[in-house]
Design a protein with these regions (language model features):
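Thiamine diphosphate
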Residues: 1-183, 193
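Acidic, proline/serine/threonine- and glycine-rich low-complexity intrinsically disordered segments
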Residues: 188-190
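Short, acidic loop-beta-alpha module within alpha/beta folds
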Residues: 193-202
Length: 202
């Protein structure tokens, strides 16, 4: 099983609960495999949005408050910048102020890879690690990708940023994850590397 297939499998498993919803732009069309088959199996649990990131994430908060478990798919992390009012001033703050559960999973793809360009390859993960109220899950192996996603969709009752590195999508064996020391264009910030191992039979 590849990294991408692991995410998709966990997503399918989570959607077996009728209160779990998938939100995002073009999510019904598969997004290169990330949401493949989701609309075919769970058409009533898929909400497709126009290009309006702040609307997507603020409505996800409303759905969570209404008892749903929304999963917001962002094909590129770069455009989370357009939703920062929701992502900084409301979603992480509400559970702390109101002592309420807010089970929102924000999936953000870091688009490093050939042909991605400067506006489709940034990694804002450090921002969210500095914000109170967010749990950040950044899987490195197919096993972690599956287990973290399934946990977020079935157990967690808090806002989670789930970071999916596009360069991992086809991987089933040892891979290297570049860890930027500061936010910047992929390849433009100083970084160190660590090797993470996965079971090739997974």
């Amino acid at each position: 099983m590849t990294f991408l297939q692991a995410i998709n499998s966990a997503l399918m498993r989570g959607l077996e609960h009728p209160k779990t919803l998938v939100l995002g732009q073009l999510v019904k069309y598969g997004l290169g495999g990330l949401t493949a088959g989701v609309f075919d199996r769970f058409p009533q649990q898929v909400i497709t949005y126009p290009v309006c990131e702040n609307l997507m994430h603020s409505s996800a908060m409303g759905l969570a408050l209404a008892g749903y478990r929304p999963v917001v798919i962002n094909e590129r992390m770069d455009f989370l910048a357009l939703a920062m009012d929701s992502l900084t001033n409301h979603i992480p703050v509400w559970p702390q102020r109101q002592a309420m559960k807010l089970p929102i999973t924000v999936v953000a793809v870091v688009g490093k890879g050939k042909g991605q360009g400067a506006q489709h390859s940034k990694n804002f993960t450090p921002w969210f690690k500095m914000l109170d109220g967010w749990t950040v899950h950044e899987p490195h192996t197919p096993e972690q990708a599956y287990e973290m996603m399934l946990y977020d969709l079935t157990v967690s009752d808090k806002p989670v940023l789930y970071v999916a590195h596009r360069e991992f999508f086809g991987k089933t064996v040892s891979v290297k994850l570049p860890n930027p020391k500061r936010v910047g264009l992929c390849g433009a910030s100083s970084r160190h590397e660590a090797t993470f191992y996965s079971n090739p039979d997974f």
